[in-house]
Amino acid sequence: MIKRREFSISSAVGAAGAIAAGWGLGALPLAAQAQAKSYKEGSDYLVLDKPAPTEAPAGKVEVVEFFWYGCPHCNSFEPQLDAWLKTAPKNVAFRRAPVSFRPDFEPHQRLYYVLEAMGKLEELHKKVFYTIHVEKQQLNSAPLVAAWAEKQGIDKAKFAEMYNSFSVSTKVRKATQLQDSYQVDGVPALGVAGRYYTSATQAKSMDRALLIATHLVALPRKAA
């Protein structure tokens, strides 16, 4: 996990990070089911003093992944997260929130939301990670991001227009506000239902953080 006070762009780009082995997380082993009963507020997960805003529709519980494209741990977490999403509770409404711990994180935030707006996110999200962590290309400025997008076949003028658009700027601002609402201190991290927060710091591993997230998804229903 990259903590807010520890990272640097150069070190993150330089460390590819081994791809962690993901596991299904669907039919949990009995030991994991028993362990769920022992998850503790304050150690395994945190409860926000003030609820964070959510975008989940009625009847759904929002799970947010906080990430940074330059983070090797976020890159390694992708297969684990993909496996969890395939077997996550059906009432989960999942979304990602790119963080900004420094002003020079903003190009990655804008890239994410431009790809989303142009319908290219599913196709290119993982390729951004690959470009940074395997090909060792830095995408930490607007010109570098724009040049990369053009290589992916995206119209240069349309990308530039969207990159600087009001809608993308609004999403970037809201993502940073959400990060602050959850008091995110490192990535990857998970926010649940606008009320709960867990990460490798609390859970001791992101595998376990996903188990805790599954447990937390059920808590709003129990509390209702």
Name these PLM-found stretches.
Residues 6, 151-224:
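C-terminal cap of thioredoxin/glutaredoxin-like
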Residues 87-118, 122-149:
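Structural microenvironment flanking redox-active thiols in thiol-disulfide oxidoreductases
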Residues 2-103, 218-224:
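Extracytoplasmic thiol/disulfide redox context detector
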Residues 62-65, 76, 80-83, 106-110, ...:
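Extracytoplasmic/secreted proteins, especially bacterial periplasmic and envelope-associated proteins
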